[in-house]
């Protein structure tokens, strides 16, 4: 199958998202073109990856690069959200500086969303900005986090509170790598795909309802779903690179979702990002229904679809105890979307009719969360 190319067009730069099969082995064909742009230069780059991806795919990537006389410095970190931390970031930076990579050299972020965020953030601050390439290996990273330039790490006070906007040179998306992805991780990425339909593409959501089984199987329908999702994300980023307006819609489910990730201390045994987003989207829809913006029937429809994909949708689906509603509210207060101590949520008027709700009353959110806890006990 011929690779698809989607171009992200921004005010100051543009870059391609290349989607196809067996692109890891062929990545050097794309990457070496960036070295030619720099003139005579020893071809060197760092590969930031995690233990899981390294075991499965690093040798294939390095072999292809080596065959094209590109020297690589692999930097392998532990898999999981807990690696999005200052100590791990420091380790990556130290290894890149110790290898004497220059500003004109590149960093490949070869992994899921955690690696993309870590590698991109490191690239943005080392020598005031190195080049970097996204090579996403999870569905979530392929359709969402690798596109748009958001990078960063977590804090004890909340998720993604330390970071930068920093665009890659390109995104190389090998759909074959998804065949080795654990089902739980694929489901988590699917939650972000559903999110795009819920934002402002009701026809896409309906298409997902009809094609969910095919998307979970390797084949052309999966590739189409990935390409459509990437195009949607690319279009929004092109219109609003720094999240001054419309791009905030991409945070549907994320205010509640980040709250839950912080509450579970980023413990993947309890909750991973896409699962948090799935629960967060249902909470956003339930809150919208409580405000009489939508009918409970629509909430049920969306929840039924997420459940059919094997995703959690309720607080009680999270293993272990959660903090009380008051403590959860303190996590929401640290959310990046808070402005002048006013809460901002992405809510909805209907299927594909999401909107940015500013000045949401904190008392209303607290009451809503207390009701959720009452129902779980």
From Swiss-Prot:
It catalyses: 7-phospho-2-dehydro-3-deoxy-D-arabino-heptonate = 3-dehydroquinate + phosphate. GO terms for cellular component: cytoplasm. Its main location: cytoplasm. NCBIfam families: aroB (TIGR01357). The keyword Disulfide bond does not apply. It is an enzyme of class 4 (lyase). Pfam families: DHQ_synthase, DHQS_C. It is found in: Cytoplasm. The gene is aroB. Belongs to the sugar phosphate cyclases superfamily. Dehydroquinate synthase family. SUPFAM superfamilies: Dehydroquinate synthase-like. Keywords: Amino-acid biosynthesis, Aromatic amino acid biosynthesis, Cobalt, Cytoplasm, Lyase, Metal-binding, NAD, Nucleotide-binding, Zinc. CDD domains: DHQS. InterPro entries: Dehydroquinate_synthase, DHQ_synth_AroB, DHQ_synth_fam, DHQS/DOIS_N, DHQS_C. Catalyzes the conversion of 3-deoxy-D-arabino-heptulosonate 7-phosphate (DAHP) to dehydroquinate (DHQ). NAD(+) binds at residues 113-117, 137-138, 150, 159. One of its GO terms (biological process) is chorismate biosynthetic process. Its cofactor is Co(2+); Zn(2+); NAD(+). Pathway: Metabolic intermediate biosynthesis; chorismate biosynthesis; chorismate from D-erythrose 4-phosphate and phosphoenolpyruvate: step 2/7. Zn(2+) binds at residues 192, 254, 273. Disulfide bonds: none annotated. This is 3-dehydroquinate synthase. Its EC number is 4.2.3.4. Binds 1 divalent metal cation per subunit. Can use either Co(2+) or Zn(2+). One of its GO terms (molecular function) is metal ion binding. Transmembrane segments: none annotated.
């Amino acid at each position: 199958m011929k690779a698809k190319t989607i171009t992200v067009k921004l005010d100051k730069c543009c870059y391609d998202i290349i989607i196809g099969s067996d692109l890891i082995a062929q990545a050097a064909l794309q990457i070496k073109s960036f070295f030619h742009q720099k003139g005579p230069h020893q071809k060197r780059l760092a590969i930031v990856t995690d233990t899981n991806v390294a075991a499965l795919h690093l040798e294939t990537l390095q072999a292809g690069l080596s065959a094209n006389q590109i020297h690589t410095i692999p930097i392998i970190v532990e898999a999981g959200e807990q690696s999005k931390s200052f100590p791990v970031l420091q380790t990556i930076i130290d290894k890149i500086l110790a290898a004497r990579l220059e500003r004109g050299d590149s960093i490949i972020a070869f992994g899921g969303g955690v690696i993309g965020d870590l590698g991109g953030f490191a690239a943005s601050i080392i020598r005031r900005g190195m080049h970097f390439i996204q090579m996403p290996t999870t569905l979530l990273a392929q359709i969402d986090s690798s596109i748009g330039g958001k990078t960063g790490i977590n804090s004890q006070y909340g998720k993604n509170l330390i970071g930068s906007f920093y665009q890659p040179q390109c995104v190389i998306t090998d759909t074959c790598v998804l065949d080795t992805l654990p089902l739980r991780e694929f489901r988590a990425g699917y939650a972000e795909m559903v999110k795009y339909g819920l934002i402002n593409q009701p026809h896409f959501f309906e298409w997902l309802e009809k094609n969910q089984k095919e998307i979970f199987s390797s084949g052309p329908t999966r590739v189409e779903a990935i390409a459509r999702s990437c195009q949607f994300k690319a279009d929004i980023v092109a219109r609003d690179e720094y999240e001054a307006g419309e791009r905030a819609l991409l945070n549907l489910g994320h205010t509640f979702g980040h709250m839950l990730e912080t509450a579970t201390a980023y413990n993947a045994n309890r909750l991973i990002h896409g699962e948090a987003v799935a629960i967060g989207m249902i909470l956003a829809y339930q809150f919208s229904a409580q405000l009489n913006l939508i009918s409970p029937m629509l909430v049920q429809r969306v929840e039924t679809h997420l459940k059919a994909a094997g995703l959690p949708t309720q607080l009680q689906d999270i293993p272990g105890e959660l903090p009380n509603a008051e403590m959860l509210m303190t996590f929401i207060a640290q959310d990046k979307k808070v402005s002048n101590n006013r809460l901002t949520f992405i809510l909805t008027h209907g299927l594909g009719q999401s909107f940015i709700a500013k000045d949401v009353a904190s008392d209303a959110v607290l009451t809503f969360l207390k009701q959720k806890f009452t129902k779980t006990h």
